[in-house]
Amino acid sequence: MTKITRDQRNFKFETLQLHVGQEQADPTTDARAVPIYQTSSYVFRNCDHAAARFGLSDAGNIYGRLTNPTEDVFEKRIAALEGGVAALAVASGAAAVTYTVLNLAQNGDNIVSAKNIYGGSFNLFEHTLPQYGIQTTFVDFFNEKEVENAINEKTKALYIETLGNPNSDVVDIESVARIAHRHKIPLVVDNTFATPYLVRPIEYGADIVVHSATKFIGGHGTSIGGVIVDGGKFDWEASGKFDSLTKPNPSYHGISFTKVCGPAAFVTKVRAILLRDTGATVSPFNAFLFLQGLETLSLRVERHTYNALKVVEYLNNHTQVESVSHPSVSTDPKQQELYKKYFPNGGGSIFTFDIKGDAQKAKDFIDNLELFSLLANVADVKSLVIHPATTTHSQCTEDELLDQGIRPNTIRLSIGCENIDDIIQDLDEAFKAVA
């Protein structure tokens, strides 16, 4: 193998997911696969070299909590797939969301978030961050006036998901980005459910993209991790709202991250300050597993999507189903329009449906499934199911559940890569059992 020297920006997605970050075989061993660098620390050539690394004037490995060669390949690859300038892998998707908000907001600040988001993120915003003085206003992002009215001088970000959890509703990223930039604040998008194979939020104006890498990126339910991608386009200096990025930072030699790190200032500060001080570091082994997942991301997402649309069609025509929450069958013309705009190749293999009956009927249906695994993860190659009201969103009040489109008879499905006939047969048998 010779070194890839051609401009990788011309490569297609399927090629990028295989090669970015490892343009030649491992220089030490000639290994073709990315090695797992299972080390806690790195040797410096001399004291001046060590000082340069710690001062950020010489890019390179300092300590395992901050950087690792295996993680570096993963970070470069996901940044390229999302169209960002840099990325940071962390220990979980929850850590990615938490670090992103803490890098933007301080005591007395707030963010504006969509109502329909992952239950863990909702709980973080509603209950945990307020203990540190950071408030969240939850709004309907389909109502631009409501979004505008929620923003004030202390608002530091807008936060949405490309496909809402758990109902796969689609937000107009481009429109929301315009609102954010009009107020000189960044748009943060959780792209976990869509993946960059289906949509790249940065191309529509998003500034920061986060993922739970545990889901589609890993794809096999083997590892926990998260990632933050810096779009590199937001002008932190011109905004005037983010002194911790633009002013001399007393905890890091008095440097200004925007001046020293340029377009990658945001994610570099997360690494240099938050990751350094709080240590939610992804393991090298998990980074290796995520790289294995990325290599087949496009293939898996194609199958997930094909199967999901078949299941949606089946459920939408079933006599025991009250409703299906999926943008492809939405009765809302705006949802149909947004789905076609952002997902021309389909999407939304994680969605909900309401079975006719009460909560017990929903639980009985779930308990009669055999192919589907009842667990809290999603986006596995295996099909999964859960009852959101009593699990993933159980921290929410009844009103909060209804605001997020979750009722007692709501069931969430994550459609896997099995043969579609077997998936539908399993659903059919469960419906017969509770008829």
Predicted regions span which residues?
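N-terminal "arm"/small-domain region of PLP-dependent enzymes with the aminotransferase-like
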Residues: 2-68, 76-77
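Conserved C-terminal alpha-helix-loop-beta "cap" of PLP-dependent enzymes
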Residues: 301, 309, 313-316, 320-411, ...
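Short, glycine/acidic-enriched capping/hinge loops at junctions between secondary-structure elements
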Residues: 47-52, 100, 425-426
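Conserved PLP-enzyme active-site core in the AAT-like
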Residues: 2-9, 17, 21-25, 87-317
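PLP-dependent enzyme catalytic core of the Aspartate aminotransferase-like
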Residues: 1-3, 14, 85, 126-127, ...
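Short amphipathic alpha-helical segments
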Residues: 59, 85, 286, 290, ...
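Conserved N-terminal alpha-helix of the aminotransferase class I/II PLP-enzyme fold
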Residues: 46-95, 120-128
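Short, acidic Gly/Pro/Ser/Thr-rich loop/turn segments
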Residues: 25, 43-47, 235-236, 297, ...
